[in-house]
Amino acid sequence: MCNHHPRHSHDNDTIRIRGARTHNLKNIDLDIPRHKLVVVTGLSGSGKSSLAFDTLYAEGQRRYVESLSAYARQFLQMMDKPDVDLIEGLSPAISIEQKSTSHNPRSTVGTVTEIHDYLRLLYARVGTPYCPEHNLSLSSQTVSQMVDAVLKLPEDTRVMILGPAVRERKGEFVDFFADLQAQGFARVRVDGEVYQLDEVPKLEKNIKHNIDVVIDRVKVKADIKQRLAESFETALRHGNERALAMEMDSGEEHWFSARFACPVCSYSLPELEPRLFSFNNPMGSCPTCDGLGNTNFFDPEKVVAHPELSLATGAIDGWDKRNQFYFQMIQSLAHHYKFDVNVAWETLPEKVKKVVLHGSGKEVIDFTYLSERGTTFNRSHAFEGIIPNLERRYRETDSETVREKLREYQNHRACPSCGGARLRKEARYVYVGGEPLHEVSAWPLTKTHRFFETLDLDGNKKQIAEKILKEITERLGFLINVGLDYLNLSRSAETLSGGEAQRIRLASQIGSGLTGVMYVLDEPSIGLHQRDNDRLLATLKRLRDLGNSVIVVEHDEDAIREADFVVDMGPGAGEHGGNVLIADTPENVAKCEKSVTGQYLGGKKSIAVPSERTPVNPGRMLVLKGARGNNLKNVTLELPLGLITCITGVSGSGKSTLINDTLAKITARELNRAQEEPAPYDDIRGLEHLDKVINVDQSPIGRTPRSNPATYTGLFTPIRELFAGVPLSRERGYNVGRFSFNVKGGRCEACQGDGVIKVEMHFLPDVYVPCEVCHGKRYNRETLEIQYKGKNISQVLDMTVEEAREFFDAVPTVSRKLQTLMDVGLGYIRLGQSATTLSGGEAQRVKLALELSKRDTGRTLYILDEPTTGLHFADIALLLEVIGRLKGKGNSIVIIEHNLDVIKTADWIVDLGPEGGDGGGKVIAKGSPEQVAKIKGSYTGKYLKVALNK
């Protein structure tokens, strides 16, 4: 059943690949059906990405870009030509990868999906502006509309028609009153009181007054239309295009304006434009925060880094005994306010703390300074305050280094002007359906979707908004269908996980409605709960049904079973991979003996449920109380120590907030003395059972090509020591530094140890070419002459972990670390492989290997965020073995995870939910997997029940 003979067809329904050798691909021939959902699976490092991204996508994209003019090409990224003999049947390609969308603080979910652009258009075309001061709508009315409004009042209501002539102006207005009398008017209303014109009291000329001319007094009846119309015309003439109808019995006022303005204060707006609602445009952004929604400020808690110390011993960095100039000021302050600089900061009176941090205001203080010559001199002036001093230095410095240092004492807070809305006042007071744009953007997507689906507009506004609303509701629907209903449009794109960012791009692609395209996706199910997986698969099928080829690199069992066609790569990783084991339907793959994927699908292999669970020790618990960051509802988290705990829950239920933003930061601050700011919580108990915390996340192990697994894990130092100890090295006087590619000496100076040289191409992307001097080996000729066991340092860096493990078998310091890299399934990566080429899952496993190789006390808390990212069934089995070893030493492991194979093997589960966003943030279930599987309201429990019974 395991044959995959390429069909020798030239039809239009097949993508034909012949002789693909990109990276570790072994000259493969493969036929993939077009317009189908194709899943590429296999072990980590087996060549899945090499096939899907570096061969199919790269060639599809390259051919499309090559068809454009040279001018257009300079704006597009050109892909390297893959090493392949032939590819036929390709369509233009779009890749949707796991990279987070943007590091730009101005990008939000709304801007990335372009929904915000449609919302701007909607608010500009059918929005109703209001006066920020009086909450009255800005709309111009004709005299007829004013008359109709009065006639709608109950019959016989007594109404006074007024012309608001003077608003908030100083003066006595004697001539004004005389002029009104000459025109035949009898009454005026001054500051709310009605007077006969000849009985108006003398007005105070330095106080602001409001004066209304009384035009008419009428009783509401059907036959007063003509009289009312004439009265309103007179009122508008005297009231600067404004008129006022006051009900005489209740005092209720009805304002009217013939101009597009507030009838009370004449506040007006020019015509509404879409850019007024853009926080990335000066016309729409809040002037205080420039549309970022938050401002930086010097946080007293960061400025006073060590409140348990005294001012003399370093409560505030830079203002203690070591800095004579600033400390003299503190001593003079202490003398003036009678406090002791040698007592702990936290015991000082509040008044003293306030003066030290914020200054003495206008109070003058005598300061005594010591000059460089040793003489003292006095100065009398107010004390600036430490925080104003930092603000001034931050403003005035030209040095980026100084700014960087000062930023350590800053924190973010919502902008005081716009409250985080990002928009200027005028835009915040325009309403559609009674709601302003910034409010609608802050709702969960489900609520926003419901609001626009049921939005009822009047008259021609309905017609104008029809097409815009269709686009908005469709796009919101696509986001909800890929399991992102808990997000909101104002959420910053920087805070999205890789999986969320990818699913947003996926939803945008469906929104674009393209057909005849080849989409290549990288594990779209990452970070997605089983419950939302069905919706994601339905979305992928919808892309396919539009007439596109959808190629997905995926390990999720449901995705593999639901695919039209499966390509299984293997059999091993790295050098041992790169072959197509089987390319067929999921049913046939499940019957294939030699395919590891097939063995798991067919049930021949599986990850076993432990026969017994490690019991919880009630005396060793970590208890976090009152966690309420983001959507958490005052959560109490109980973690049994010495066990493996899984934190589960649907996407957006609060797992990352609880673990990464709260628990990890508290423990890092308390145990590792890190400068962390956890999300709000009340209390934590049980830290005495731990001595350190290690957060093994998916951030890159280095951001430059110089970082690599060997340097990160500390392997490279003992390897360089071995080379420095070779007789020829000692003879030449070479030390360890000679074998570093980061410092002068042994490295090739032509490329400064990079191995490649960047060539700037104006019409094409920058090209990296191997260095002509060292031919990509990074070192100079003399250094490469030094050999250890017949290999030079460059050849060692080019070895895979597996090859190096054998090569350094007799060197325990090196082989132990290499063995741990193999244990986490990374035998295929090269020691000198650039960190920038490692996936998030690989980077996480390199970190895990580093921790495994350290000798530990058995009192460490390990935090892992979705460690199964990018892992095949067989890799997960390896990972669980490694985590089991950490537990075996007495350590505690907390894993945020959706993968049921990991969840079912945990000792303890804490399930958050029930839903995502506002509907989540509570602990729904806790206990062993068997206990959680019985809990009715838990989505995780429902799927876990099935997994435990397999």
Swiss-Prot record:
A zinc finger (C4-type) spans 262-289, 748-774. GO terms for cellular component: cytoplasm; excinuclease repair complex. It is found in: Cytoplasm. PROSITE patterns: ABC_TRANSPORTER_1, ABC_TRANSPORTER_2. SUPFAM superfamilies: P-loop containing nucleoside triphosphate hydrolases. GO terms for molecular function: ATP binding; ATP hydrolysis activity; DNA binding; excinuclease ABC activity; zinc ion binding. ATP binds at residues 42-49, 649-656. Keywords: ATP-binding, Cytoplasm, DNA damage, DNA excision, DNA repair, DNA-binding, Excision nuclease, Metal-binding, Nucleotide-binding, Repeat, SOS response, Zinc, Zinc-finger. Its main location: cytoplasm. InterPro entries: ABC_transporter-like_ATP-bd (IPR003439), ABC_transporter-like_CS (IPR017871), ATP_grasp_subdomain_1 (IPR013815), P-loop_NTPase (IPR027417), UvrA (IPR004602), UvrA_DNA-bd (IPR041552), UvrA_inter (IPR041102). Residues 319-596, 616-945 form the ABC transporter domain. It holds the Pfam family UvrA_DNA-bind. GO terms for biological process: nucleotide-excision repair; SOS response. It comes from the Bacteria. The keyword Mitochondrion does not apply. HAMAP family: UvrA (MF_00205). PANTHER family: UVRABC SYSTEM PROTEIN A (PTHR43152:SF3). Belongs to the ABC transporter superfamily. UvrA family. The UvrABC repair system catalyzes the recognition and processing of DNA lesions. UvrA is an ATPase and a DNA-binding protein. A damage recognition complex composed of 2 UvrA and 2 UvrB subunits scans DNA for abnormalities. When the presence of a lesion has been verified by UvrB, the UvrA molecules dissociate. Forms a heterotetramer with UvrB during the search for lesions. This is UvrABC system protein A. It comes from Neisseria gonorrhoeae. The lineage of its organism: Bacteria, Pseudomonadati, Pseudomonadota, Betaproteobacteria, Neisseriales.
